[in-house]
Amino acid sequence: MTLNPLVQFDIKKLIEIKIFGFDISFTNSSIYMLLASILALTYFYLAFYNWKLVPSRLQVSAEIVYNLVADMLNQNIGAKGHKFIPLFFSLFIFILFCNLLGMTPYSFTVTSHIIVTFALAILVFLTITIVGFVKHSLRFLTLFLPHGTPLWLAPLMIVIELFTYLARPISLSLRLAANMMAGHVLLKVIASFTISLMIYLKFISIPLMVILIGFEIFIAVLQAYIFTILSCMYLNDAINLH
């Protein structure tokens, strides 16, 4: 693992399960997604089960996260977005805990795999599309023709806008997976060099690793935020036809 920084992303079967020829084996990826969900639920249960008017530090931290997501929806969509707070709050928390869990030694970074991030992105994409059609019916299709487009340019613009719309889940998932993978590969490579140089540069190598880990934690939080706020912007397009 020290020599190959990509080994940390290998998916390993722990319990092999096949149903009608479909492989639905329980893997290390499954464990870390389940663990991230359990940790998130435990965190918010402990934060809110004994809610107080004068909040504890844990309650304050949970309220900050909730208000962050609520503000995202309020700023992008307005009052119409309040009903979607549970969805986007769950999305943000799941990605955040998966990212942070991947920072622990010898763990597995679930969000470095495109299949996981694409599943999240396609869930958001389908939800937003359904919301658009339910709210606007066939008028939702006007999203693909910008207002004021000349008639002769309409066919080309429809194709471009449709392609852009369909590319959203791809770009959303690739951005998250690529950033998480790149960050962990870089951290692994530098960590390998740091171990080799500790004999000669121990006063530099250890602080360098601490700085890099801190930066990677920042990236983990930032990527969860970016994924969620872009999803909010896409929902705004569907609701307000922007």
Swiss-Prot record:
Cross-referenced InterPro entries: ATP_synth_F0_asu, ATP_synth_F0_asu_AS, ATP_synth_F0_asu_bact/mt, F0_ATP_A_sf
Free-text function comment from the UniProt entry: Key component of the proton channel; it plays a direct role in the translocation of protons across the membrane.
UniProtKB keywords: ATP synthesis, Cell inner membrane, Cell membrane, CF(0), Hydrogen ion transport, Ion transport, Membrane, Transmembrane, Transmembrane helix, Transport
Superkingdom of the organism of origin: Bacteria
A single Gene Ontology CC term: proton-transporting ATP synthase complex
Source organism per UniProt: Rickettsia canadensis (strain McKiel)
The UniProt record lists the keyword Thylakoid: no
This protein's encoding gene: atpB
Matches recorded under NCBIfam families: ATP_synt_6_or_A, PRK05815.2-4
Topology within the bilayer: Multi-pass membrane protein
A Pfam family assignment: ATP-synt_A
Main subcellular localisation: membrane
Chain ranges passing through the membrane: 31-51, 84-104, 114-134, 140-160, 189-209, 210-230
Localization, UniProt: Cell inner membrane
Keyword Membrane annotated: yes
SUPFAM superfamilies found in the cross-reference section: F1F0 ATP synthase subunit A
Subunit structure: F-type ATPases have 2 components, CF(1) - the catalytic core - and CF(0) - the membrane proton channel. CF(1) has five subunits: alpha(3), beta(3), gamma(1), delta(1), epsilon(1). CF(0) has three main subunits: a(1), b(2) and c(9-12). The alpha and beta chains form an alternating ring which encloses part of the gamma chain. CF(1) is attached to CF(0) by a central stalk formed by the gamma and epsilon chains, while a peripheral stalk is formed by the delta and b chains.
GO molecular function, one term: proton-transporting ATP synthase activity, rotational mechanism
UniProt-recorded name of the protein: ATP synthase subunit a
Homology family: Belongs to the ATPase A chain family.
